[in-house]
Amino acid sequence: MAASALRGLPVAGGGESSESEDDGWEIGYLDRTSQKLKRLLPIEEKKEKFKKAMTIGDVSLVQELLDSGISVDSNFQYGWTPLMYAASVANAELVRVLLDRGANASFEKDKQSILITACSAHGSEEQILKCVELLLSRNADPNVACRRLMTPIMYAARDGHTQVVALLVAHGAEVNTQDENGYTALTWAARQGHKNIVLKLLELGANKMLQTKDGKMPSEIAKRNKHHEIFNLLSFTLNPLEGKLQQLTKEDTICKILTTDSDREKDHIFSSYTAFGDLEVFLHGLGLEHMTDLLKERDITLRHLLTMREDEFTKNGITSKDQQKILAALKELQVEEIQFGELSEETKLEISGDEFLNFLLKLNKQCGHLITAVQNVITELPVNSQKITLEWASPQNFTSVCEELVNNVEDLSEKVCKLKDLIQKLQNERENDPTHIQLREEVSTWNSRILKRTAITICGFGFLLFICKLTFQRK
């Protein structure tokens, strides 16, 4: 058959393996003609065509075969139904068609529900979210657990699907349920390093004090897996977000967390999630989330907040208690600014050697802090754009700032080299100057050494004379 008659892409089905291929999801290409199914086919042939249509995601052929009498809940390999397979590959269109034809959204096979299959599917979060919302709209239970006692929200938290987590909670998912190892959804998010999911779960009432069966809290799990930011977030805050949305009704929670997709005519009502920005993350980490609206109203960015003076805090309505928390965080960051402009001209000209040395040491220390900070950002920055969950501006803005940083670093390097050459020149001139007058400190040090040696010598002679005198008296 000509290659042009071939359609579709091969897609792997299911999450298990078997030596038997007689009743499996066949991987391959489906030969489709433009004609409808006009003649009756043997039931086995229809099933084979149905499997192939499901495999390549051919929605039209699936509908035709269902019209011809194929059961929407047919059992295939491993006892899976077509709906479970469609959910496993996050094919939202197939899920919609099968549900509209009466497929059972609450079907389970070996304690594996279709909702769990959708939450653990390999696909984009957008498609997974659509599948999950379709299943929940058909009364799929969000709290049914698998054999390992893991619920759908645990799978979503483990795989980093923030929007799916929010949607499940909005439909009644329990956030503090524990699996066979004592892991909660929060523990899974901390283990995998999903910071935004950690923040959202705390807001939705997750208990960060629940321990695993080996006695580990989520913060300790995060630390063990080297997610230090999440460790700090869970360890050093009083969990001000806990239970913030627990008292809301289901409808209010959905409105609070989710926003509806504008394309209602084509798609089912799907949801989007508003991610945290850097300011919100900083404030939540300090337990100051109540300041978010205040700072946004005054157009105060995180960078502005970190450089505020005490009078600016008061002017912007920030209480002294909140000021102390922010200043303590800044002290931990060890970011200190050298105020050269505050030095008088006379001080600049007559600065002592000790003061100049302290200045150089402080400057070097700050450079070290900057290097460490940049290295930490490089380590934590996701290499895959799909993993970025915070609100980011255009990447072009970041690259332009980085270019300015590179230029400033090069300029700083040039200035430091000039300073080094100047100091070396002064040192050489001083060593070669025959009229150089010794510093008072050096003279005083030399004089003190002479006095000490003289005093010791006199005491020694005196002690020797005293012994000789005693000896003569005895004789």
From Swiss-Prot:
Which gene name does the record give? Answer: ASZ1
Assembly information from the UniProt record: Interacts with DDX4, PIWIL1, RANBP9 and TDRD1.
Q: Keyword Ribosomal protein: yes or no? A: no
Q: Which residues form the SAM domain?
A: 272-334
**InterPro entries the record matches:** Ankyrin_rpt, Ankyrin_rpt-contain_sf, Asz1_SAM, SAM, SAM/pointed_sf
Supply the source organism's classification: Eukaryota, Metazoa, Chordata, Craniata, Vertebrata
A Pfam family of this chain: SAM_2
Q: Which organism is it from?
A: Homo sapiens (Human)
Q: What is this protein called?
A: Ankyrin repeat, SAM and basic leucine zipper domain-containing protein 1
Q: What does this protein do?
A: Plays a central role during spermatogenesis by repressing transposable elements and preventing their mobilization, which is essential for the germline integrity. Acts via the piRNA metabolic process, which mediates the repression of transposable elements during meiosis by forming complexes composed of piRNAs and Piwi proteins and governs the methylation and subsequent repression of transposons. Its association with pi-bodies suggests a participation in the primary piRNAs metabolic process.
Tissue specificity as recorded in UniProt: Expressed exclusively in the testis and ovary and at higher levels in the adult testis compared with the adult ovary.
Sorted alphabetically, the keyword list is: ANK repeat, Cytoplasm, Developmental protein, Differentiation, Meiosis, Phosphoprotein, Repeat, RNA-mediated gene silencing, Spermatogenesis
Positions where Phosphoserine occurs in the chain: 17-18, 20
Main localization is cytoplasm
ANK repeat placement: 45-74, 78-107, 110-144, 148-177, 181-210, 214-243
* UniProt-annotated stretches for the region Disordered: 1-25
Q: Does the keyword Cytoplasm apply?
A: yes
Subcellular location(s) of the protein = Cytoplasm
- Which domain of life does this protein belong to? Eukaryota
Give TM regions.
Answer: none
Concerning SUPFAM superfamilies, the annotation shows: Ankyrin repeat, Pseudo ankyrin repeat-like, SAM/Pointed domain
**GO BP terms:** cell differentiation; male meiotic nuclear division; regulatory ncRNA-mediated gene silencing; spermatogenesis; transposable element silencing
Q: GO CC annotation: what is one? A: pi-body
